[in-house]
């Protein structure tokens, strides 16, 4: 058997997220149904994914891995999948990778982009299912200052839906916004981190837009970010505006080390140790 990397794109509007669910249409469910069929395999082909996107969230740069026979004809596989999959999901490429590659745990970072229209924008009905409206005008200088204040290793519990046994400690690597020079004046908020917990990106954007529109202050955001439990005052933005754009990985020789590091559960001691090292 050989490990294969799949690069995948999908429009999440008509999917109940990535992960397989009973009686629900999901991206994982579609792919795990059709991959063994087009390869004429009599055993299941479970996929491991970089980011388990929620219902309605899109992806241009999703990555998964799967173990398949050594002699897979990737050209034929892609051609057959394009015939049987619906147009809202595409497997863009398939290539062999080292056995140490893990789409989830080997990832160094995930980059999401959230697209918004504010009162300065000119909405386009054709793309409305991929952009979320927000009330008022967004001051991007305020938004970028607020985003910068959240960078680094910290507990993002205030921005995450609770999951029993799951850590909410993450390293936020980049968080900035820009207004595109497009006919709509779309605002793009880029958020990149080593990993994300449930609803974290949409909650971060909800908090940042509250500050950028003047409805909330920077002090409010600072107090929210310091909380170790879910903040009810933070709006979770609609899924339609969010797209997983890219996943970054180390060189092949560092894959196993990165996977082992990612599997280790982080605690508040890690945050304290980092603060001490920065002095």
Swiss-Prot record:
Annotated keywords: Isomerase, tRNA processing
CDD domains named among the record's database cross-references: PseudoU_synth_EcTruA
E.C. code: 5.4.99.12
Gene Ontology biological process terms, A to Z: tRNA pseudouridine synthesis
Gene, per the UniProt record: truA
Catalytic center residues: 54
Pfam families: PseudoU_synth_1
Reactions mediated catalytically: uridine(38/39/40) in tRNA = pseudouridine(38/39/40) in tRNA
Protein purpose: Formation of pseudouridine at positions 38, 39 and 40 in the anticodon stem and loop of transfer RNAs.
Transmembrane segments: none
Subunit record text: Homodimer.
InterPro entries: PsdUridine_synth_cat_dom_sf (IPR020103), PsdUridine_synth_TruA (IPR001406), PsdUridine_synth_TruA_a/b_dom (IPR020097), PsdUridine_synth_TruA_C (IPR020095), TruA/RsuA/RluB/E/F_N (IPR020094)
Name under which the protein is recorded: tRNA pseudouridine synthase A
GO molecular function: RNA binding; tRNA pseudouridine(38-40) synthase activity
Annotated family: Belongs to the tRNA pseudouridine synthase TruA family.
Ligand binding (substrate): 112
